Amino acid sequence: MNQDKSKETSELDDLALPRSIIMRLVKGVLPEKSLVQKEALKAMINSATLFVSFLTSASGEIATNNNRKILMPQDVLNALDEIEYPEFSKTLKKHLEAYELALKEKRLKLPNVSDVDNRKKAKIDAHDTTPLDEEKDELEEERIAEDIAQNEVEQNIDDVEDLEEVNDTLDANAESPQIETIHLTDATGNPIEDSSESDSEESLQLNDSS
């Protein structure tokens, strides 16, 4: 017997409502500077937990009798009447109406789903399409600039090669100058060999002139 009672107490403690919430409810009802013993607060917490469990069970039976698996607010209100708490039913109904009104106002303040989707789509289009076009333009400009730079490099290479060929020709001419061969002949046209410099100057003639 004691074991069963201890088990029930343990299960009730596991399902107990938060102590802070119950304490706020107690302070909101009792006069100021009222004191609550620890055992009294514990009893209130257990009572609140039992009441919620009892009300849930009664509401579930009403939903089942109406062939529904979903528990509706009206089921809870009807359950309060069945467990003989009609005054709670009236108060709870007012709170539910205020809650539904607040939800309705909140929905009206929220933007339309289609408008949100359109704005998101516009942002995606602006984010994805524009950068792609700009990227294509930038790539085209870079390609043109590279072509121009490549042409300039090739032209410079050709100019350097031409200049090197000219320099090579000049260097070759400087290293091996062309010497015109002159044949010395006498008055009759016979070649003169081993003649002195003075004699050579007097009888110097080009073969072409003969």
Swiss-Prot record:
Report which superkingdom the organism of origin falls in: Eukaryota
Where is this chain compositionally biased, Basic and acidic residues type? 121-130
- What's in the keyword line of the UniProt record? DNA replication, Nucleus
Please give the GO cellular component terms listed in this UniProt entry.
chromatin; cytosol; epsilon DNA polymerase complex; nuclear replication fork; nucleus
A Pfam match is CBFD_NFYB_HMF
> Where is composition skewed (Acidic residues) in this entry?
131-140, 155-168
Enumerate the CDD domains for this protein.
HFD_POLE3_DPB4
Q: Which GO terms describe its molecular function?
A: chromatin DNA binding; nucleosome binding; protein heterodimerization activity
Q: Where in the cell is it found?
A: Nucleus
Which GO biological process categories is it annotated with? Answer: CMG complex assembly; DNA damage response; DNA replication-dependent chromatin assembly; DNA strand elongation involved in mitotic DNA replication; DNA-templated DNA replication; heterochromatin formation; leading strand elongation
> Which cysteine pairs are covalently linked by disulfides here?
none
Q: Region Disordered: start and end of each range? A: 121-140, 147-210
What is its biological role? As accessory component of the DNA polymerase epsilon (DNA polymerase II) participates in chromosomal DNA replication. It is required during synthesis of the leading and lagging DNA strands at the replication fork and binds at/or near replication origins and moves along DNA with the replication fork. It has 3'-5' proofreading exonuclease activity that correct errors arising during DNA replication. It is also involved in DNA synthesis during DNA repair.
PANTHER family in alphabetical order: DNA POLYMERASE EPSILON SUBUNIT 3 (PTHR46172:SF1)
> Subunit details for this protein?
DNA polymerase epsilon is a heterotetramer consisting of cdc20/Pol2, dpb2, dpb3, and dpb4. Heterodimer consisting dpb3 and dpb4. Interacts with the replication factor dpb3, cdc20, PCNA and rfc5; the replication licensing factors mcm3 and mcm4; the FACT complex subunits spt16 and pob3; the CHD1-type remodeler hrp3; the SWI/SNF chromatin remodeling complex subunits snf22, arp9, arp42, ssr1, ssr3, and ssr4; the histones H4 and H2B; the histone chaperones Nap1 and h; and the histone deacetylases sir2 and clr6. Interacts with dri1.
**Could you tell me what this protein is called?**
DNA polymerase epsilon subunit D
- Supply the source organism for this entry: Schizosaccharomyces pombe (strain 972 / ATCC 24843) (Fission yeast)
Taxonomy, top ranks, is: Eukaryota, Fungi, Dikarya, Ascomycota, Taphrinomycotina
Gene coding for it: dpb4
